[in-house]
């Protein structure tokens, strides 16, 4: 009789625990949904509050962490180059993006979104410091984004303006353009662990366009890669294709917080196509081998 009673109470206790866990999960999903709507309205601070609450309620749930990192990134991307925080503060904030992504991967190694935002955090820290000063981090960025791509990315915003699968193609395309191709020679590639590849950059950016043809940033980045490759390897048809893209994207609807900046930068690139290879939304990058050698002396 006692054993039966014990079993009964254990069953009731287990059922109660499961019910609480299910209620918490529902609550967290609701909080994440609220944070998503606030993110879509560029209300990043309010979105953060919902995510913080979700982290407390469901501490083993990975999703709120990559979303928190995304909020930091997009908040910073909304600033024009001349209006961003000081370099030291930028680096600190991008390290926060990476920290949130690391927590995300700890909770779910197979969530590709965690790896996508880990790469973003490291990558933006690198462009803030300068690509040539950050080459030691390049393979970490590449590895994170390749892993994200291989794991598969399912996130797509409700309004269709953000798609993680398109985003990782965009990110890798940008990576293979900004990291210099001269690193591909021995022994530099062996030291750094990776190198640029402009053909691969164009391939990834075309994939991003195929995935989301109306995204202003996808169009701009394809044009930038075409301009860079076209000038470097004397491909005038690529330069003309790029110029047409930069003109045409001006008529695309602005749906993301940084779209206005990207349209301005498209006009800037049309005015001076020599900027293409080292172009980044946050900061123009020095890429030359001479600058790299001088910096090492």
Regions found by a protein language model. Name each.
Residues 1-10:
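Bacterial N-terminal signal peptides that target proteins for export
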Residues 33, 67, 74, 117, ...:
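"A position-specific structural signal for the A-helix of alpha-solenoid helical repeats
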Residues 64, 114, 166-168, 218:
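TPR alpha-solenoid repeat register
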Residues 38-49, 70-110, 117-166, 171-207, ...:
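Short coil/linker segments at helix-helix boundaries
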Residues 208, 217-225:
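Extended serine/threonine-enriched, polar tracts that run as long, contiguous segments within proteins
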Residues 19-63, 78, 239-242, 246, ...:
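Extreme N-terminal leader/anchor segments
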Residues 161-168, 260, 264, 271, ...:
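Extended ligand-binding clefts on enzyme/binding-domain cores
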Residues 9-17:
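Bacterial N-terminal signal peptides
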């Amino acid at each position: 009789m006692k054993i039966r009673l014990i079993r009964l109470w254990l069953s009731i206790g287990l059922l109660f625990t499961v019910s609480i866990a299910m209620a918490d999960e529902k609550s967290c999903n609701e909080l994440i949904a609220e944070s998503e709507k606030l993110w879509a309205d560029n209300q990043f601070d309010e979105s953060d509050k919902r995510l913080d609450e979700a982290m407390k309620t469901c501490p083993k749930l990975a999703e709120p962490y990559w979303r928190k990192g995304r909020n930091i990134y997009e908040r910073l991307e909304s600033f024009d180059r001349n209006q961003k925080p000081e370099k030291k503060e930028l680096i600190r904030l991008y390290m926060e993006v990476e920290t949130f992504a690391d927590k995300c991967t700890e909770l779910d190694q197979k969530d590709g979104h965690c790896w996508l935002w880990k790469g973003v955090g490291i990558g933006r820290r690198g462009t803030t410091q300068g690509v040539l000063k950050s080459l030691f981090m390049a393979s970490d960025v590449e590895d994170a984004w390749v892993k994200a791509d291989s794991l598969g990315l399912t996130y797509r915003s409700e309004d269709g303006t953000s798609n993680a699968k398109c985003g990782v193609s965009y990110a890798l395309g940008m990576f293979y353009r900004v990291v210099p191709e001269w690193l591909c020679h021995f022994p530099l590639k062996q030291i750094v662990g990776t190198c640029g590849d402009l053909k691969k950059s164009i391939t990834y950016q075309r994939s991003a366009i195929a995935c989301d043809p109306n995204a202003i940033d996808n169009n701009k980045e394809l044009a930038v890669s075409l301009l860079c490759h076209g000038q470097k390897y004397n491909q005038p048809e690529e330069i003309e294709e790029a110029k047409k893209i930069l003109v045409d994207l001006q008529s695309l609807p602005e749906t993301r917080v940084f779209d206005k900046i990207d349209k301005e930068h498209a006009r800037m690139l049309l005015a001076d196509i020599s900027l293409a290879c080292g172009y980044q939304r946050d900061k123009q990058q020095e890429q030359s081998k001479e600058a790299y050698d001088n910096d090492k002396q």
